[in-house]
UniProtKB/Swiss-Prot annotation:
NCBIfam families: PRK00823.1-4. It comes from Xanthomonas oryzae pv. oryzae (strain PXO99A). This is Putative pterin-4-alpha-carbinolamine dehydratase. Belongs to the pterin-4-alpha-carbinolamine dehydratase family. Disulfide bonds: none annotated. Its EC number is 4.2.1.96.
Amino acid sequence: MTDLIPLEQAHCLPRKGSDHKLGEARLAELLPQVPGWELAEAGMALTRTFRFPDYCRTLAFVNALAWIAHREDHHPDLGVHYDRVVVRYSTHDVGGLSENDFICAAKTARLYDQGITG
């Protein structure tokens, strides 16, 4: 699906059932496309910590990320702290990671890299 266009330009599709859970080979293909992200929980989740100079910019990032999550209908778990946000993606309906997680990880990284909050 996302092999033809960059992940950050793709859009999430409804995914339910274990048929959409990514296997180890596909995870190995997609992970290099989202630098800075790590597999967590034995490959069941994708995580990354984003750092900010102050709380205002931290919350600006969270609010911008909320808009992306709403638009894609794919929502991360967030750990919000004064100077950082821990973002965790996993697709509960497939019991692990789906392509939607990588699409949203790429969009999240682009948001951060573009300096939307600063």
